């Protein structure tokens, strides 16, 4: 941020909504400093009201940023510049004094566990980008709460942005507006600054009326100063700073300091036919089915799944030793392709109104369309692709971008959990890790202990996804599904997880690993997935209660024969689904050991080294 300026600045920007005098002093100072730096024409303090939202949506429609989808109620479509479609790991940095605070120093090459930038380089980058970057535009002031307003687990942020798309999306994804300022008072807040980096008048014409500045895109986190600064991208993960930037990168660092966990996890409630309920949290990399699992329709009669959150969990042990979790978000920012009545009926019901779609295709009758939507088109209805061109299946390219999104209010989900906004959070009894593994990894196994479970999280690997800019089908290490989101050194993060076992009175959740994606020799999935995954959750539920049978294997406990309820399923090759090959696991543990030794190096906790050795030994005795 620029040098602290005197209070009561003579701002050239005109305040068009709200009043500077109504702001807490620290918020006002933050706003004035950055208005001086970015030089917007107008300042708009967001109140979060319906009326304000309607006005902004109408304004974006006039400017061609959004199109109204007339088939649904208050739904909108944004098509971005094709250069601004995903999170960009290579341009996302954490700024600390010492590199080792941010990433372990790897043995060879570059760290894959985050990108560090020095304070000097960041100051240069800031000064090359932000002065005058909002000329001709409005600076919106967004007061937002991550988590239910007033929950002891919640945190408040203020985002300054020149993008009305960000304002409308943040209103869905967070609790936003005047009530947040009232709750904040003189309290602490995370300072978020965002600009699309396109001052007016424009130097070159926009693509799709979507302002962005891909050449200069930078997303920076300054954990010591509680600041997030993002430039040049309008895409959700880079511009909705409450999401990954605050709720994971910044929050994981706060959690380390304050003794809690901020994780890339869904939270679901599952109730058995007897009416007993448990809450589980699950970490999968992006596009591995977190949203589908969180909103599952169980195929097992009498079982019920309810959704607390589909992406992020903030968890803290309470005085009784229960791990309590809240969903810090207020909406779902879900990947659209592959979402259908078959794969996720509850998501389809959620997105029928008050939803902003980005980079999906549009039908000529004012609806949305994407790969895997599985809905026949009415005769005569045509499709316009996310590239704004007439589209037909013969074109040989997808109609929707693989990372196209829906941004929709969580309260609209038909199976939202009754306690989803409970200020004290819900008690987590099981933690699930998982990834997309076509070979070698069984459908489900249970960790042998908390320490072993932390190792299982550290060893997570998955086929690459569309949510980041990587292409192709390679198996990537994605520890805890947090690889793109660590806010500090991953070795210290592992030590923090291990330290939870020292918490007095802690009732440690059981830890499981799942793989819905194992394939047979013909390349067909061995497990039907989706609602049938409730059968795996049933086994976990009963394991937590000490009821279900399990068989000890070198990698953990797997269901005993007949312990997994397969009633009503066609033929399932259980042998192949649960087979554990010595050859595969020798290679797997070698890859994991090499990765952790290389990437975490001197910061790898000795408990994790012990788990690697113990696993090697168990495999050698197979």
Swiss-Prot record:
Record PTM: Acetylated. Lysine acetylation by p300/EP300 is increased on high glucose conditions. Lysine acetylation promotes ubiquitination by UBR5. Acetylation is enhanced in the presence of BAG6. Deacetylated by SIRT2. Deacetylation of Lys-91 is carried out by SIRT1 and depends on PCK1 phosphorylation levels. Phosphorylated in a GSK3B-mediated pathway; phosphorylation affects the efficiency of SIRT1-mediated deacetylation, and regulates PCK1 ubiquitination and degradation. Phosphorylation at Ser-90 by AKT1 reduces the binding affinity to oxaloacetate and promotes the protein kinase activity: phosphorylated PCK1 translocates to the endoplasmic reticulum, where it phosphorylates INSIG1 and INSIG2.
Reactions accelerated catalytically: oxaloacetate + GTP = phosphoenolpyruvate + GDP + CO2; L-seryl-[protein] + GTP = O-phospho-L-seryl-[protein] + GDP + H(+)
Molecular function in Gene Ontology: GTP binding; manganese ion binding; phosphoenolpyruvate carboxykinase (GTP) activity; protein serine kinase activity (using GTP as donor)
Binding site for substrate: 87, 235-237, 286, 403-405
Modified residues (Phosphothreonine): 178
Enzyme Commission number(s): 4.1.1.32, 2.7.11.-
Function: Cytosolic phosphoenolpyruvate carboxykinase that catalyzes the reversible decarboxylation and phosphorylation of oxaloacetate (OAA) and acts as the rate-limiting enzyme in gluconeogenesis. Regulates cataplerosis and anaplerosis, the processes that control the levels of metabolic intermediates in the citric acid cycle. At low glucose levels, it catalyzes the cataplerotic conversion of oxaloacetate to phosphoenolpyruvate (PEP), the rate-limiting step in the metabolic pathway that produces glucose from lactate and other precursors derived from the citric acid cycle.
Quaternary structure, from the entry: Monomer.
Protein name: Phosphoenolpyruvate carboxykinase, cytosolic [GTP]
Organism: Pongo abelii
Taxonomic classification: Eukaryota, Metazoa, Chordata, Craniata, Vertebrata
């Amino acid at each position: 941020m620029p040098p602290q300026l005197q209070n009561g600045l003579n701002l050239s920007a005109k305040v068009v909504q709200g009043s500077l005098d109504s702001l807490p002093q620290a918020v006002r100072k933050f706003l004035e400093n950055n208005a001086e730096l970015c030089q917007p024409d107008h300042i708009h303090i967001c109140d979060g009201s319906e009326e304000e939202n309607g006005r902004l949506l109408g304004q974006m429609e006039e400017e061609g940023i959004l199109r109204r989808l007339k088939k649904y109620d208050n739904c909108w479509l944004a098509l971005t510049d094709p250069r601004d479609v995903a999170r960009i790991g290579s341009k996302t940095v954490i700024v600390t004094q010492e590199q080792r605070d941010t990433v372990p120093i790897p043995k060879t090459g570059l760290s894959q566990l985050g990108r560090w930038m020095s304070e000097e380089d960041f100051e240069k980058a800031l000064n090359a980008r932000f002065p005058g970057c909002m000329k001709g535009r409005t600076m919106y002031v967004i007061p937002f709460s991550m988590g239910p307003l007033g929950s002891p687990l919640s945190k408040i942020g203020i985002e300054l942005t020149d993008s009305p798309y960000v304002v409308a999306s943040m209103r869905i994804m967070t609790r936003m507006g005047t009530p947040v300022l009232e709750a904040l008072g003189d309290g602490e807040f995370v300072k978020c600054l965002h600009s699309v980096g396109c001052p007016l008048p424009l130097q070159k014409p926009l693509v799709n009326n979507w302002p962005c500045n891909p050449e200069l895109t930078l997303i920076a986190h300054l954990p010591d100063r509680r600041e997030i600064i993002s430039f040049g991208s309008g895409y959700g993960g880079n511009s909705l700073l409450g999401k990954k930037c605050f709720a994971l990168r910044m929050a994981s660092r706060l959690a380390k300091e304050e003794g809690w966990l901020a994780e890339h996890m869904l939270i679901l409630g599952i109730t058995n036919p007897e009416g007993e309920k448990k809450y589980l949290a699950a970490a999968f990399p992006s596009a591995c089915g977190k949203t589908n699992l969180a909103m599952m329709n169980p195929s097992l009669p009498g079982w019920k799944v309810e959704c607390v959150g589909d992406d992020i969990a903030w968890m803290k042990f309470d005085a009784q030793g229960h791990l309590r979790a809240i969903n810090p978000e207020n909406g779902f920012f879900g990947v659209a392709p592959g979402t259908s009545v078959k794969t996720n009926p509850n998501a389809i019901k959620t997105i029928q109104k008050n939803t902003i779609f980005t980079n999906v295709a549009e039908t000529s009758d004012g609806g949305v369309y994407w790969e895997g939507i599985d809905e026949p088109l009415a005769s005569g209805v045509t499709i316009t692709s996310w590239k704004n061109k007439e589209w037909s299946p013969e074109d040989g390219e997808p109609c929707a971008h693989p990372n196209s999104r829906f941004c929709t209010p969580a309260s609209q989900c038909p199976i939202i959990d009754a306690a989803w906004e409970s200020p004290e959070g819900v008690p987590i009894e099981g933690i699930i890790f998982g990834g997309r593994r076509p070979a070698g990894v069984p459908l489900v196994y249970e960790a042998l202990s908390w320490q072993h479970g932390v190792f299982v999280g550290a060893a997570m690997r998955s086929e690459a996804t569309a949510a980041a800019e990587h292409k192709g089908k390679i198996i990537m290490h994605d520890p805890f599904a947090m690889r793109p989101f660590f806010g500090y050194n991953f070795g210290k993060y592992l030590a923090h997880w291990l330290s939870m076992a020292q918490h007095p009175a802690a009732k440690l959740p059981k830890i499981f690993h799942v793989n819905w994606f194992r394939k047979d020799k013909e390349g067909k999935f061995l497990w039907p997935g989706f609602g049938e995954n409730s059968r795996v959750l049933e086994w976990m539920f009963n394991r937590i209660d000490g009821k279900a049978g399990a068989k000890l294997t070198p990698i953990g406990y797997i269901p005993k024969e007949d312990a997994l309820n397969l009633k009503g399923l066609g033929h399932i090759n259980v042998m192949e689904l649960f087979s554990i090959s010595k050859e595969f696991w020798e290679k797997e543990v070698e890859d994991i050991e090499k990765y952790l030794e290389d990437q975490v190096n001197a910061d790898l906790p000795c408990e994790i080294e012990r788990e690697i050795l113990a696993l090697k030994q168990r495999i050698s005795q197979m």
